[in-house]
């Protein structure tokens, strides 16, 4: 399982830990990932995703998982999230 957000694509970054004497040692900046269960209003079921805390805030800001996925670009989404997006768009097209 990779350390990558399924919705925003945030991943591990690398950099330096710099000491007071300006010595640099390699370090990793890990994304703040959480396993979250989100409710899809369109599909009428809950979905379990591993997303960053920042992505969770973005989902709530946009008005839920469905609204977030409809607006999101395909490139940054994981394979699981892409399938969800297609399901939601198909369901919305049927309803319209």
From Swiss-Prot:
One BP term from GO: translation
Gene3D superfamilies: Ribosomal protein L28/L24
Disulfide bonds: none
Record key words, sorted: Ribonucleoprotein, Ribosomal protein
Record-level GO cellular component terms: cytosolic large ribosomal subunit
Source superkingdom: Bacteria
Signal peptide segment: none
UniProt KW Ribonucleoprotein keyword: yes
InterPro entries hit by this protein: Ribosomal_bL28, Ribosomal_bL28/bL31-like_sf, Ribosomal_bL28_bact-type, Ribosomal_bL28_sf
Residue spans crossing the bilayer: none
GO molecular function: structural constituent of ribosome
NCBIfam families in the record: L28
Family membership: Belongs to the bacterial ribosomal protein bL28 family.
Protein name from the UniProt record: Large ribosomal subunit protein bL28
Species, as recorded: Methylobacterium nodulans (strain LMG 21967 / CNCM I-2342 / ORS 2060)
Gene for this chain: rpmB
């Amino acid at each position: 399982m990779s350390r990558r957000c399924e919705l925003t694509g945030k991943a591990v970054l690398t950099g330096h830990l710099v000491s007071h004497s300006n010595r640099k040692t390699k370090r990793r900046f890990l994304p703040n990932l959480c396993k979250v269960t989100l409710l899809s209003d369109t599909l009428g079921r809950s979905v379990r995703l591993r997303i960053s805390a920042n992505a969770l805030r973005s989902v709530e800001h946009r008005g839920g998982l469905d609204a977030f996925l409809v607006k999101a670009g395909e490139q940054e989404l994981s394979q699981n999230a892409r399938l969800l997006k297609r399901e939601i768009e198909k369901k919305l097209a049927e309803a319209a």
